[in-house]
Amino acid sequence: MHGLLALGLGSLLAGAAPHPMHTVITEITHEAATGSAAIRIRVFADDFQAVVAGGSDSAMAAYVRGAFSLADRSGRVLALGWEGAATDGDVLVIRLRVAAPAGLSAVRVKSELLSDRFEDQVNVVRAVYGGRTATLLFVRGDPVKALP
């Protein structure tokens, strides 16, 4: 069910028409060979620009780091490395990387991107790690959630 939800919401981010929902899709892929995880955040560019003035890398990175985080099993927040951002049609794709030598199991996720701006904000986080896929769904006011 969560996979279909993510697919459906992802389709919304692919269209060029005005969007009826405020949605952020985040994909986290653990790369065991490097002991790190690649993070791709897809967000409607106009929604993101309404929150981050100027659109500089430093402004975008500061906002993302304040609204999205990963913490290890002990609660230590993992440093998000900025790899850049680019537009793909109406969508802004933000690329990050995080050291995750122990994998993503039990990692705690905070996803509050744009929740401060839009009451109907829905954030989907899809993580691929250790031969499995897990999907977390966040709405405004949700607490941090752990990956299984």
Show which residues each predicted segment covers.
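Bacterial Sec-dependent signal peptides at the C-terminal "C-region" and cleavage site
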Residues: H2-H19
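N-terminal soluble domains immediately following signal/targeting peptides that reside
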Residues: A17-P148
